From Swiss-Prot:
SMART domains reported for this sequence: LIM (SM00132), PDZ (SM00228), ZM (SM00735)
Subunit structure: Interacts with alpha-actinin.
Record-linked Pfam families: DUF4749, LIM, PDZ
GO terms for biological process, alphabetical: actin cytoskeleton organization; heart development; muscle structure development
InterPro entries found in the cross-reference section: PDLI1-4/Zasp-like_mid, PDZ, PDZ-LIM_domain, PDZ_sf, Zasp-like_motif, Znf_LIM
PROSITE patterns documented for this protein: LIM_DOMAIN_1, LIM_DOMAIN_2, PDZ
GO MF, one annotated term: metal ion binding
Residue ranges annotated for the PDZ domain, each copy included: 1-84
Organism: Gallus gallus
Name of protein: PDZ and LIM domain protein 3
Length: 315
């Protein structure tokens, strides 16, 4: 259903367009800025713009529509179409006539119950009534206990303990305590609790102790004990020693450079004069010192009648 919407100027209007004849789509509002003039005028995303300031948008491109909206300085008049929202409802026929189905949207009254009125407020076990007339209840315990705790006698004791706090005269009706059975197990348990006993030894330990005492001739329970001796670890005979650097004298761990049965670090394999690293280069030994070619020539003077020739080692 077409609607006329007027936005008071000036810009910004607070909505975004999409579509146009160049997109083969109608001009549609895709976004509304909250609190903007478009939001105040109740424009919604999805509204189709039919006319802008009285001009039909049927043959307008997207840029033409933007220019028309920008040209509106004082007010912007839009004619929009908004899709109607329909709710499905079943059709009920009465006497051959179709009538819409009536729905009662009135809320049903519910009984108000505050939170906590129907809960066990104190830390007491929940009980289920077995006989209301006799006021006897069966306690359901949820503890991991032996079966004996759930016997009729224990349940009755727990019942009387609860009735004492509820009924003032309940203590007069308490049954007399039953006689304690004088069994062998009962007497053994109580004798262990009342009289402290000496620590007991197992039969196998006694036999072993007697055998040891008979062989050694020493009194029972004593034996000679020597303090443990800590052995000093010694080096293995086949262990490989760490090579020593010929220049700095420290051990070499990792890459080793060997020249004439002498070991050096890669960073110590340098000329003794200019400290030039001789790795991947020619090196010379003069009087036990390592030199580059230039400084080796300066220190080595051949005898008269001989000429110095550089000889490189075979790789």
């Amino acid at each position: 259903m077409p609607q006329n919407v007027i936005l008071p100027g000036p810009a910004p209007w607070g909505f975004r367009l999409s579509g146009g004849i160049d997109f083969n789509q109608p001009l549609i509002i895709t976004r509304i800025t909250p609190g903007s003039k478009a939001s105040t005028a109740n424009l919604c995303p999805g509204d189709i713009i039919v006319a802008i300031n009285g001009l039909s948008t049927e043959n307008m491109t997207h840029n033409d529509a933007q220019e028309r909206i920008k040209a509106a300085a004082h007010q912007l008049s839009l004619r929009i179409e908004r899709a109607e929202t329909k709710l499905w409802s079943p059709q009920v026929s009465e006497d051959g006539k179709a009538n819409p189905y009536k729905i009662n949207l009135e809320a049903e009254p519910q009984e108000f119950k505050p939170i906590g009125t129907a809960h066990n407020r104190r830390a007491q076990p929940f009980v289920a009534a077995a006989n209301i007339d006799d006021k006897r209840q069966v306690v359901s315990s949820s503890y991991n206990s032996p079966i004996g705790l759930y016997s009729s006698g224990n349940i009755q004791d727990a019942l009387h303990g609860q009735l004492r706090s509820l009924i003032p005269n309940a203590s007069q009706n308490d049954p007399a305590p039953a006689a304690v059975p004088q069994s062998d197990v009962y007497r053994m348990l109580h004798s262990n609790q009342e009289e402290p006993s000496q620590p007991r030894q197992s039969g196998s330990f006694k036999v072993l102790q007697n055998l040891v005492s008979e062989e050694d001739g020493r009194p029972v329970g004593t034996r000679s004990v020597k303090a443990p001796v800590t052995k000093i670890p010694t080096g293995l005979p086949g262990a490989q020693k760490v090579p020593q650097c010929d220049k700095c004298g420290s051990g070499i761990l990792g890459t080793v450079v060997k020249a004439r049965d002498k070991y050096r670090h890669p960073e110590c394999f340098v000329c003794s004069d200019c400290n030039l690293n001789l790795k991947q280069k020619g090196y010379f030994f003069v009087e036990g010192q390592l030199y580059c070619e230039a400084h080796a020539r300066a220190r080595m003077r051949p005898p008269e009648g001989y000429e110095a020739v550089t000889v490189y080692p075979k790789c």
